[in-house]
Amino acid sequence: MKTKYVARLLATAAMVALSQPALAQSNSTATSPGDTPVSNAPSASERAAPVTAAAFDPQVSGQEETADTTAASASDIVVTGSRLTSNGGNAPTPVSVITTENLIRTAPTTLADGLNQQPIFQGSISPARGDTVQSNRVRAGNYLNLRALGTARVLVLQDGHRLVPTGNNGGTDANLVPQLLIERVDVVTGGASAAYGSDAVSGVVNFVTAKRFEGVRTLLQKGVSTFGDDASFKAAIAGGTTMFDGRLRLVASAEHYHQDGITSKAARPLGADNYSYGGLGTAASPFAFYRDVRQSASSDNGYIVTGPLAGRQFALGGTIQAFDPGTAIGRGGVAVGGDGARNNPEASSLTPSLTTNQLFGRATFDVTPSLELHAEIGYNVAENTDRPVGFSRNGNLTIFRDNAYLAPNTLAALGSTQSFTVGRTFLEIGPQPSEQRVRSLDINVGLRGKIGSDLSWDVSYVRGRSKFNTDSLEVDLTRFYASVDAVRAADGNIVCRITVTNPGLQNGCVPINTFGNGAVTEAARNYVLQHSLWQVINRLDEVSANVSGSLFNLWAGPVSFAVGGNYRRQSIDQSSNSDPSIALNLTGIRGFAGAVRFPFTNVGIARGAYTIKEQYVEVQVPLLKDSAVGRSLTVNGAARNTNYSTSGTVQTWKIGGVYEPIDGIKARATLSRDIRAPSLFELFAGDTVVQVGVTDPLTRTFGTAVAVSGGNRALTPERAKTLTAGLVLTPSLIPGVSASVDYYDIKISDAITVPYNAPAALNICFAANGNSPACDLITRPLGPTNTTAANFPTSISQVPRNVADVQTRGIDLELGYRRSLFGGTVDLRGLATRLISYKLQQNPSVSPVENAGTADLPGPTTAIGLPKWRATISANYSISGLTFGGQARIVGGLDRSHILSYVDNTVPPVVFTDANASYTFGDTPGKPEMFVTVNNVLNQRGAFWPITGTPGIQLPTVRSLYDIQGRYFTFGIRSRF
């Protein structure tokens, strides 16, 4: 079936291509020198029309004429959002057109960082916005998130085509586009599945590259934070030329970027203070903030949890000393002050390092005036390194009576006790680095051409392959527990017990002295530290063919259409050396009943593939032109049929229109049905086990629970309905002003989700008195009502299911003003998003929960904040080569929760300010431009926001919302020849 489908697509393309010489010859007499050649026309995958206020005014959107690019007039700008060729005002779906110049002005690091400063992007995953706690998921890169609907529900494109996924989550790292060759980024802020297929639920981000670039561009820049860390360096070069009278066009770029990261949480204010919450989050016991919160069942020396010596701790030499429990704060397992264990902020990173290297090349050749051949290749490598958290055993380390390191007086005090448990933080083991690397290769070849003057066609083949590797240095628990069980051999030497009872197992075992901070030797440390390795290989093959043009003319203009189809195959192959489905060999090992080899990274296998066959049609009909009831009215409709080999056939559609009653006012609206298919990892992943520190409100105990995640082959595509409606204003009475306002309503049914992360499942189950679906995910040894410490949960399920419904509504606002002033140009721009509602229904048995204005929305490890207002306001002035300006990024106030109770539930608004300046030496060869950018000029901290999990494991703020880097300086020079 696959072969026949691909053959039909290729045969159609070949027939069209073979007809080109005759068509070109028959039409040659009708082509004048002033006609636009085919190489200037966008492919069907790139065709669209601008529909934001900025799109109607190229100066507002930052477009300007340069030596190597020519800005089109407003009516000629072509942006993403449709498969049709159209002039500037006829596409009904809202699109933000953001030029590279505007993005790098205030975010010179990467284009994705600049996008994340826009109010419509919320909850994106990046080194600064993600966490460094878990190594079992992708941390490298920048995965964009529109409207906090998830990185999997936004489609990332380059020049209108898909890129190979770069991790196991199905997403694509937006850092890996050729940054120096990107002209603009088109952000579709409405459903676009009818035009682009699966994943375009919250929208589309299309990185548009320079097609006719000639000359050379260079970039050198360095950056550093006000704290003297997180230094960055970027070097890039791009070049373009033509040959054979312009018929052959070559473009290439090479880029290198490195950022050191922030290697210690103590490097930022509050990062070393171990803030956390006390209380249970109920009305009777609300959460309250406390400093220096410690684990009361663990210490750096070894706290004795059970047996006749319970409540005391070890000292060096295996003797016993008193333990100060600190002050209870109404939450089991933690206390303020005392001798309890605290997270060592020096041992874990705040942000990982990041290094990217990129190569890109494109060749375009005009075979005939109406037939073009193109080929492009991109190769990227991204690496990061961080140190997640230190190693500890939270009250569950079993020590046996025959342990050789116990002092004689301790043995005497134990009496007849044969074993007891200890809680210990092993500071001596030190930092445990985790490295991730992504290598990706994308190849795109194709043909495009024209048939007569009204029809265009294109056919292309895309092939991509990515390889994602993680190498985490962690404690091998089988080795660790074998080493802890230290006894005296017959010759009097201290050895691992397993070498006596089971010779040949755990060869080379080095005994560990666990009693007292500093007792672990370097040899023992080196023995227990091993590499947890996992790898993901993604493959993408896609063939597509498109035809578009005009059918016939009506009284108001031509009826436009586009039809096409594509065949896509994607596969994933994930492997690891710590697959939790493979039973551990625990022969001869006492005190360890665990099922995983490593404390943090235990990744199951995932192997699978699916194929997708799609056909689409889109039609645009003009109904009014310069009539008594309006200047213009255009309606647009699209439909797509998609067949998945895993879940069958699904249809998507869109209908919309644009009405211009008078000059300067346009109204637009769309209604669409969109889908997101489950990712290969969501379908085929094996079980992945992670140990997480949680406070169990039922037993009032802090400990380590096992979170089990995996794939679900019964998953089906999510279905969404999207409504957008808005106005675009370009009043002629106020030259230079443009504005837009758009309402959106997105409702997703059968959403794929892990219903609750581990802490949320425990808290919500407890708050509901055991009557919540969250309780079904928790496994306890003694049932759901027993409140003793022995009933601490043994596992918490985190398998994805089609059980959730999500609905979000809001308003996007944009205002721009650009005018000449005092011999220069002033450019003002404001963007804002008003979140009216964000309702999440975890499954049909519970009521929807309103998350707008709170941080209740679950994220991968921590909550995502959803303020009702977010805005970015910028002002820039240019004169005689000098440009300077500033930007304010406003994060509105919000409540900490609408579900849980807090003593202080209100979080005030926070404003971050940025400044930039540049000067271009216009008379110097290369026209070098010196620039400086200062982000977070006032060194503003984010809102104070401790987490409820392990004290001190995270900086006490919401990373998805607030800046954690502090004031940051970037200096550099750009040139073009």
Task: List where the protein language model places each region.
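N-terminal periplasmic accessory domains that precede
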Residues: L111-G114, N142-N145, D173-P178, D199-L220, ...
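C-terminal beta-signal and adjacent terminal beta-strands/loops
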Residues: K747-S749, I836-S837, A888-R896, T920-F977
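C-terminal beta-barrel architecture of Gram-negative outer-membrane proteins
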Residues: V690, G830-G922, L938, I947, ...
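Surface-exposed, low-complexity loop segments enriched in small/polar and acidic residues
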Residues: N168, P269-Y277, A315-T356, F360, ...
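Extracytoplasmic beta-strand/coil segments of soluble accessory domains associated
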Residues: S61-D68, N87, N116-H161
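N-terminal Sec signal peptide and the immediately downstream disordered periplasmic leader
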Residues: K2-P119, R147, A236, G240, ...
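Short loop/turn motifs that connect adjacent beta-strands in outer-membrane beta-barrel proteins
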Residues: R212-G215, G228, F244-R247, T368-L371, ...
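Short acidic/polar hinge/loop motifs at secondary-structure boundaries
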Residues: H161-T189
